[in-house]
């Protein structure tokens, strides 16, 4: 395979080297707003010379406490040291629980293991294959950020792409590498950090990432890195969790909050098991966390973390179409689409919904926000690139952390 330039391939968690895209001076004091959900809240406004952006809601009586919760546009951790701490937590979680590995009981690293994972993945996510377009990647230099157990990796390789994987965890790198060994496929596998990709500028024709970049503290920085490693004219295909989704706005904000009260009793755990069909072990872990600190569990950021990828997941974020597009301001031909509907979001009736209606619901209020974008063929000075007007919508859901 081609020797793609690699820089600091072993620096899994490097220190911050670049200023944050959205750092501003002249922040204003928090201002009060009314709450949709009853509790007194403050909306925090940031003002620059040309625009203002409301970025957070803080449930607190103290302006000082509100100020401490300001988290800008997907850069969800305010200090470099805290950012590194959170990233280590993320790394540890996914090292112990590689993406999708919990959906099979087959021995890890066996052909049956990979086969069962793929059957489940593409049954649950039928739109994924068309969103990526593997058949169009022959001969392209493809980078996947966050390879998981290698389902898409294998499809890229079999389509003739010159495939490279980078993942924060050694577990995912090893599992995907083993898959390639079993299939006689060629690829490159590197443990590295999406916020500081270990590749030279312009190394790839396509950068793909499915459900990964919303788990890193500084998502805007990862998008800048995607832009950097793409060759002129190269494409990015990225999936992030969708803020304006039924899952976030209804399931997490309302249904899961009500379920938390149900999980406080033994009978409630049994009832929840019948309604949501989740593993009892997972429900009991939720119950333990609720018992330890009910208020902390019901904090919206914690609700998002613990009810997306497992009760011990340390970090998830959600993005609107607008906030996602703003992160891709350096690109052209930016297009978004929404996919994925889970029948379990409507307990009791979800599985009765016809597939045609389910597909429509997914296209409107689905959980997966896909962003398709292309790097400009010619470098343009930053002040000549049209940036979208600043949104007054909170950007990532660390930007809407509710502090009890």
Where are these regions (language model features)?
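Conserved alpha-helix/loop element of class I SAM-dependent methyltransferases that forms part
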Residues: 108-140
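N-terminal, positively charged/glycine-rich alpha-helical extensions of SAM-dependent methyltransferases
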Residues: 63-118, 404
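A short acidic, Gly/Pro-enriched loop at the edge of an enzyme's catalytic core
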Residues: 195-206
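Core SAM-dependent methyltransferase catalytic element
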Residues: 332, 354-396, 402
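Short alpha-helix
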Residues: 314-332
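Class I SAM-dependent methyltransferase SAM/SAH-binding core
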Residues: 140-196
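Conserved class I S-adenosyl-L-methionine
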Residues: 235-293
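A short glycine-rich, Lys/Arg-flanked "PGG" loop and its adjoining helix->strand segment in the class I
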Residues: 220-232
């Amino acid at each position: 395979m081609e020797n793609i330039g690699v820089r600091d391939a072993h620096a899994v968690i490097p220190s911050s080297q670049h200023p944050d895209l959205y750092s501003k001076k002249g922040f204003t004091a928090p201002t009060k707003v009314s709450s949709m959900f009853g509790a007194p809240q403050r909306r925090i406004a940031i003002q620059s010379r040309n625009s203002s952006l409301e970025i957070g809601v803080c449930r607190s009586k103290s302006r000082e406490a509100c100020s401490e919760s300001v988290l800008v546009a997907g850069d969800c951790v305010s200090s470099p040291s805290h950012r590194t701490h959170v990233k280590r937590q993320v790394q540890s979680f996914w090292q112990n629980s590689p993406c999708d590995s919990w959906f099979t009981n087959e021995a890890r690293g066996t052909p049956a293991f990979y086969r069962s994972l793929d059957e489940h993945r593409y049954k649950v996510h039928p739109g994924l294959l068309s969103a990526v377009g593997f058949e169009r990647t022959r001969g392209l230099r493809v980078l996947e950020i966050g390879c998981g157990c290698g389902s898409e990796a294998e499809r890229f390789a079999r389509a003739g792409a010159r495939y490279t994987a980078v993942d924060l965890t050694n577990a995912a790198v090893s599992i995907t590498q083993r898959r390639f060994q079993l299939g006689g496929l060629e690829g490159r596998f590197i443990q590295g950090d999406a916020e500081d990709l270990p590749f030279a500028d312009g190394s790839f024709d396509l950068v793909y990432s499915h459900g990964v970049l919303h788990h890193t503290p500084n998502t805007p920085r990862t998008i800048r890195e995607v832009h950097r490693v793409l060759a002129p004219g190269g494409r990015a295909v990225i999936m992030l969790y969708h803020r304006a989704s039924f899952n976030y706005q209804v399931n997490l904000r309302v249904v899961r909050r009500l379920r938390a009260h149900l999980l406080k009793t033994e009978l409630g755990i049994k009832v929840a098991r019948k309604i949501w069909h989740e593993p009892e072990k997972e429900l009991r872990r939720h119950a333990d966390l609720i018992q330890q600190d009910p208020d902390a569990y019901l904090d919206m950021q914690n609700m998002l973390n613990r009810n997306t990828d497992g009760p011990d997941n340390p970090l998830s974020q959600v993005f609107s179409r607008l906030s996602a597009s703003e992160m891709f301001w350096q690109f052209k031909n930016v297009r978004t689409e929404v996919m994925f509907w889970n029948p379990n979001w409507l307990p009791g009736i979800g599985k009765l919904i016809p597939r045609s209606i389910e597909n429509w619901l997914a296209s409107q209020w689905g959980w997966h926000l896909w962003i398709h974008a292309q790097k400009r063929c010619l470098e343009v000075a930053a002040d000549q690139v049209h940036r979208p007007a600043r949104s007054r919508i909170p950007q990532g859901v660390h930007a809407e952390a509710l502090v009890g």
